[in-house]
Amino acid sequence: MPPSYNEVTSWKPSNLVSIANGIFALKASLDLEAPLAGNPVLDLTPAEWTGEARGPADSRAESVTRWLRNVADEYGDLASAATSGAANIESAVTTLKNATEAAGDQGYILDRGSREYTVTFDPNTAPSGAEYSADLAFQHQTALPAHGTASDQAVTDTKNAIESALSEIGGITPASIATASGTMTRTTNQAKAFEQVYGLFLIDGA
């Protein structure tokens, strides 16, 4: 059963855009920081650092820089998922609002708190002289819950896209980096924090 009209229209997908903007800013910062992470080692000349440790140090520096760039890309994907999802949810909500208004203009009034999308005919809101039509009532009774379902599906699709992006972020940390620096823990915590924020968006329509 789809969420009611009142539930759907209480959602505020614009909040996802605000979150996405913050993630895009984080991506930009990571893009800038990525070369700085490895360059202090990679920029040393062979004369400045020789010995058996140089090769592994270079490899690790390259790994850190490459990982940061990959993380930046994944955060970009996460932000894009949130932005696209917000647009899709907003579009679905607008479609439901417009269909409800159109039905009302013909005299078919939606019970906006009903998850069954009950429609009743009110001659006072219908065009002058209009009478109840079983065909029109059926059309609105069928279309409106379909729009409610589409709105719910837009939220589900957005949730799945965001969870997929979060999973990618959590899965790309090299073991050497995670073990030595605790970066994996921080990345996982960031992912969980974002998921909690998004969860509140779903539950509270915030």
Q: Which residues does each PLM region occupy?
A:
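N-terminal secretion-targeting helices of virulence/extracellular proteins
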Residues: 1-178, 182-193, 202
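Membrane-active amphipathic alpha-helices enriched in small hydrophobic residues
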Residues: 197-206
